[in-house]
């Protein structure tokens, strides 16, 4: 048995956390969630677990007959894309700053604060590939905005194919054979945030009379068979599609940027499944486990069915992994989505300096200013310990090291 069993007054919690730290607050948050009467069998916890807003990051929450919107959160469909290119390290320019600049030009990133200013994190004139992807989203958007007109006043179309802020990134990496990979991390951007925020608030309003009886107001839920349950599922599915297409559009534009710098073909003539991956790690969907149909919410966790490929990034400056799932049913066929934080962003900014950031990322062409100190490698768990703790969940196919990193 590779997991620690945490018993509660209702469902148990199975934690793949051997050799990695778990905060007391995160444990309590997990216990609170496990108290909900509709938890199916047990909650599974990944080794990158840490306290989260609304729900514990690194948790897999199986439910029957209900869904907790705050467990999915506001970054609906957040996840990873990775592509193994036809390039090798020798094909990259000597001056990697040139490549980083080309990627930053190709993909809007960051955010401009203040009214009446053009947001640098959104398109002014979206390119053709963004238009094509928006066409796949348009029918769902029409339903969403007709039923909930509030979503008309959101960043939607002009956020498609953009990176965002925080821990979202685009990286150029090398594997063990010095093959070049593109790896990126983003979600459903402004529209996903608006959908998540609205339905979290709505669940709490709908449960206003009984909200105080819950272990936490963040555990407010929609019951299956209600109108809001159906609407939430439909809205979330749309936001998850937005997130997936958002990453695809960015990948296409990074490929073009890389091609313009190297003057070489970037995509391989034939790409294997393990060499081009697009996976969510913040989402909910219906799945079958232990012979029953249930809803599985993965909050900072990746699906790892037998033979399924996934991406586990380390912190900025650390190793990342392309993995293949082992289909461990006890984890609801899941694995971690990264290294997991050992301290808050606020604490990291107080504890570390720009000089620390420069030293920690000396081998990576990336931003090294005060605004990204919260992403310093020391703010995260040891990725090797995280991988060791989930050796029965996934096997490593490729180990990657970053050489270029773009942050919002």
Curated annotation (Swiss-Prot):
<dbReference type="GO" id="GO:0006396">
    <property type="term" value="P:RNA processing"/>
</dbReference>
<feature type="binding site">
    <location>
        <position position="407"/>
    </location>
    <ligand>
        <name>GMP</name>
    </ligand>
</feature>
<feature type="binding site">
    <location>
        <position position="281"/>
    </location>
    <ligand>
        <name>Mn(2+) 2</name>
    </ligand>
</feature>
<comment type="subunit">
    <text>Monomer.</text>
</comment>
<feature type="binding site">
    <location>
        <begin position="313"/>
        <end position="316"/>
    </location>
    <ligand>
        <name>GMP</name>
    </ligand>
</feature>
<feature type="binding site">
    <location>
        <position position="75"/>
    </location>
    <ligand>
        <name>Mn(2+) 1</name>
    </ligand>
</feature>
<keyword id="KW-0464">Manganese</keyword>
<feature type="binding site">
    <location>
        <begin position="167"/>
        <end position="171"/>
    </location>
    <ligand>
        <name>GMP</name>
    </ligand>
</feature>
<keyword id="KW-0692">RNA repair</keyword>
<comment type="function">
    <text>GTP-dependent RNA ligase that is involved in RNA repair. Joins RNA with 2',3'-cyclic-phosphate or 3'-phosphate ends to RNA with 5'-hydroxy ends. Also acts as a DNA ligase in case of DNA damage by splicing 'dirty' DNA breaks, characterized by 3'-phosphate (or cyclic-phosphate) and 5'-hydroxy ends that cannot be sealed by classical DNA ligases. Repairs tRNA cleaved by colicins D or E5, does not repair damaged 16S rRNA.</text>
</comment>
<feature type="binding site">
    <location>
        <begin position="281"/>
        <end position="282"/>
    </location>
    <ligand>
        <name>GMP</name>
    </ligand>
</feature>
<dbReference type="GO" id="GO:0005525">
    <property type="term" value="F:GTP binding"/>
</dbReference>
<feature type="binding site">
    <location>
        <position position="320"/>
    </location>
    <ligand>
        <name>GMP</name>
    </ligand>
</feature>
<comment type="function">
    <text>Able to catalyze tRNA splicing in vivo in yeast, but bacteria are not known to splice tRNA.</text>
</comment>
<keyword id="KW-0547">Nucleotide-binding</keyword>
<keyword id="KW-0436">Ligase</keyword>
<keyword id="KW-0479">Metal-binding</keyword>
<dbReference type="GO" id="GO:0006281">
    <property type="term" value="P:DNA repair"/>
</dbReference>
<feature type="binding site">
    <location>
        <position position="78"/>
    </location>
    <ligand>
        <name>Mn(2+) 1</name>
    </ligand>
</feature>
<comment type="similarity">
    <text>Belongs to the RtcB family.</text>
</comment>
<dbReference type="InterPro" id="IPR036025">
    <property type="entry name" value="RtcB-like_sf"/>
</dbReference>
<dbReference type="InterPro" id="IPR001233">
    <property type="entry name" value="RtcB"/>
</dbReference>
<dbReference type="GO" id="GO:0170057">
    <property type="term" value="F:RNA ligase (GTP) activity"/>
</dbReference>
<dbReference type="GO" id="GO:0042245">
    <property type="term" value="P:RNA repair"/>
</dbReference>
<feature type="binding site">
    <location>
        <position position="168"/>
    </location>
    <ligand>
        <name>Mn(2+) 1</name>
    </ligand>
</feature>
<feature type="binding site">
    <location>
        <begin position="337"/>
        <end position="340"/>
    </location>
    <ligand>
        <name>GMP</name>
    </ligand>
</feature>
<dbReference type="GO" id="GO:0030145">
    <property type="term" value="F:manganese ion binding"/>
</dbReference>
<dbReference type="Pfam" id="PF01139">
    <property type="entry name" value="RtcB"/>
</dbReference>
<feature type="binding site">
    <location>
        <position position="78"/>
    </location>
    <ligand>
        <name>Mn(2+) 2</name>
    </ligand>
</feature>
<feature type="binding site">
    <location>
        <position position="185"/>
    </location>
    <ligand>
        <name>Mn(2+) 2</name>
    </ligand>
</feature>
<dbReference type="GO" id="GO:0006974">
    <property type="term" value="P:DNA damage response"/>
</dbReference>
<feature type="active site" description="GMP-histidine intermediate">
    <location>
        <position position="337"/>
    </location>
</feature>
<dbReference type="InterPro" id="IPR052915">
    <property type="entry name" value="RtcB-like"/>
</dbReference>
<protein>
    <recommendedName>
        <fullName>RNA-splicing ligase RtcB</fullName>
        <ecNumber>6.5.1.8</ecNumber>
    </recommendedName>
</protein>
<keyword id="KW-0342">GTP-binding</keyword>
<dbReference type="GO" id="GO:0003909">
    <property type="term" value="F:DNA ligase activity"/>
</dbReference>
């Amino acid at each position: 048995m590779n997991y620690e069993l945490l018993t509660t007054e209702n469902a148990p919690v199975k934690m793949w956390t051997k050799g990695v730290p778990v905060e007391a607050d995160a444990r309590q948050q997990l216990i609170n969630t496990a108290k909900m009467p509709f938890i199916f069998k047990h909650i599974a916890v990944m080794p990158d677990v840490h306290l989260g807003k609304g729900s514990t990051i690194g948790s897999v929450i199986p439910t029957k007959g209900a869904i907790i919107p705050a467990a999915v959160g506001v970054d609906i469909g957040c996840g990873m894309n990775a592509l193994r290119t036809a390039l090798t390290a020798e094909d990259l320019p000597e001056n990697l700053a040139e490549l980083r600049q080309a990627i930053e030009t190709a993909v809007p990133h960051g955010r401009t604060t203040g009214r009446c200013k053009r947001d640098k994190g959104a398109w002014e004139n979206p390119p053709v590939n963004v238009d094509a992807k928006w066409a796949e989203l348009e029918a769902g958007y029409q339903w969403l905005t007709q039923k909930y007109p509030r979503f008309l006043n959101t960043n939607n179309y002009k956020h498609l194919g953009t990176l965002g802020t925080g821990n979202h990134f685009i990286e150029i990496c090398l594997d063990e054979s010095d093959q070049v990979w593109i790896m990126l991390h983003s979600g459903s951007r402004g529209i996903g945030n608006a959908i998540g925020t609205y339905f979290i608030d709505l669940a709490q309003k709908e449960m206003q009379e009984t909200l105080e009886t819950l272990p936490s107001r963040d555990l407010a839920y929609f019951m299956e068979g209600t109108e809001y349950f159906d609407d939430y599922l439909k809205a979330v599915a749309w936001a998850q599609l937005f997130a997936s297409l958002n990453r695809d559009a960015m990948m296409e534009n990074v490929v073009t940027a890389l091609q313009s710098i190297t003057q070489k073909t970037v995509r391989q003539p034939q790409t294997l499944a393990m060499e081009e991956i697009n996976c969510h790690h913040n989402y909910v969907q219906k799945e079958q486990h232990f012979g029953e149909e249930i809803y599985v919410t993965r909050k900072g966790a990746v699906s790892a069915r037998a033979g399924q490929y996934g991406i586990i990034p380390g912190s900025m400056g650390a190793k990342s992994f392309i993995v293949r799932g082992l289909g461990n049913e006890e984890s609801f066929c899941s694995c971690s989505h990264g290294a997991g934080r050992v301290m808050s962003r606020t604490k990291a900014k107080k504890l570390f300096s720009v000089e620390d950031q420069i030293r920690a990322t000396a081998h990576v062409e990336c931003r090294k200013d005060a605004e990204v100190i919260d992403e310093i490698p020391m703010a995260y768990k040891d990725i090797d310990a995280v991988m060791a703790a989930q050796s029965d969940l996934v096997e490593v196919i490729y180990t990657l090291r970053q050489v270029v990193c773009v942050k919002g």
